[in-house]
Amino acid sequence: MITETAAEPTVPAVPAAEEATEARGREEPAWPWKDAPIRTLVQRIHQLQAERAQGFRRLEEWLAPVQGLRAWGRGLRVPTCRRGHRQYLRSGPDYDFARYRSTVHGVTQAFAAASREVLAVEAELGGPRRQPLLAGHVRSLQELEQTRLGTVALLQLMETPELAGQEDAVRMQQLKMKVIKTMEAISEVLQDLRFDAESAE
């Protein structure tokens, strides 16, 4: 499973998204890891994964205590993306949509920034570095994260009060299992990436 400890603090982060938006109209700065060793690129991928995990935790702060919560949190023992949505649904009947939208927007921007950087690492590994195996791992990681995000979003949608009565328990269980399997696959890809990167250097 992916945890916050997967990140190694030895690699500096890319300038924040706020700094990038302030620089509109100016030429975009050079990518800071252009000539970095492969090991550093792999460490950065792990840091980006930790940032994604943090984004999922922010979404968790907005989920409702619907009946499926116990099965989701305890029975399956999965890090969920539910707290954010829980807070939103608890704010009903006069839902605090503006705050929820703000949280989702912030998380979406963080995910988009992480995705852009992951794609840049993939291009660097697949192009100038001539490491197609490592680039393939990075691409797989990106695809798995897209699957995870889409599945979590669908789960959140299915748990809204308006749809809770129409909830299909079997479908919910399938989606929860899909999240688990996707997270396991992400962990495997990260391990393969680290192992193959050590062999490449």
UniProtKB/Swiss-Prot annotation:
Residues 1-28 are annotated as: Disordered. Residues 1-18 have a biased composition (Low complexity). Disulfide bonds: none annotated. InterPro entries: REX1-B (IPR039491). It comes from the Eukaryota. This is Required for excision 1-B domain-containing protein. It comes from Homo sapiens. The gene is REX1BD.
